[in-house]
């Protein structure tokens, strides 16, 4: 929500979700919902209350497919960030390229970093892949 404030978007219709992302996206697909854009920040690993296990490398393709089903020809973006994983930005970008091929647009990938104050070194923090409408 701080990002919405910093981006001067507090008055925009942003729907904030704090839920199991895989269950939420599957539910929204069943309901036939569509979104203008999606920010996706899944964990590397998670365990549900009933012993369910989430592993990013294993479950991300299905989650991206569900997210694709929530977008249509009016949708603007899908942004995915991932931390401390065995997949590269290139691999995640290819997953997005395949999932979003029918919508056109472009996929960009890269690393996120913070600059160390003392020596000015860039310290990697995560990778990202972003699909956007051309």
What are these regions (language model features)?
Residues 66, 71-78:
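Short glycine-dipeptide loop
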Residues 75-134:
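C-terminal catalytic and target-recognition region of SAM-dependent MTase-like enzymes
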Residues 27-29, 49-51, 90-91:
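Short, well-ordered secondary-structure micro-motifs
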Residues 1-39:
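S-adenosyl-L-methionine
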Residues 2, 23, 62-69:
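Alpha-helical scaffolding segments of alpha/beta enzyme cores, especially the outer helices
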Residues 22, 43, 84:
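Catalytic metal-binding/acid-base residues of hydrolase active sites
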Residues 18-19, 35-66:
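Mobile active-site "lid"/loop adjacent to the S-adenosyl-L-methionine
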């Amino acid at each position: 929500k701080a990002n919405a404030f910093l981006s001067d978007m507090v008055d925009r219709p942003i729907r904030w979700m704090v839920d199991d992302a895989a269950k939420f996206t599957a539910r929204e697909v069943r309901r036939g919902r569509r979104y203008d854009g999606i920010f996706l920040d899944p964990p590397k690993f998670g365990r549900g209350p009933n012993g369910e296990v989430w592993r990013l490398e294993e479950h991300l393709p299905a989650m991206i497919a569900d997210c694709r089903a929530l977008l249509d020809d009016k949708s603007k973006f899908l942004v995915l960030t991932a931390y401390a994983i065995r997949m590269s930005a290139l691999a995640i970008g290819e997953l997005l390229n395949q999932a979003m091929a029918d919508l056109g647009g472009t996929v960009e990938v890269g690393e996120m970093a913070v600059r160390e104050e003392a020596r000015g070194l860039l310290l990697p923090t995560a990778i990202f892949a972003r699909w956007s409408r051309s």
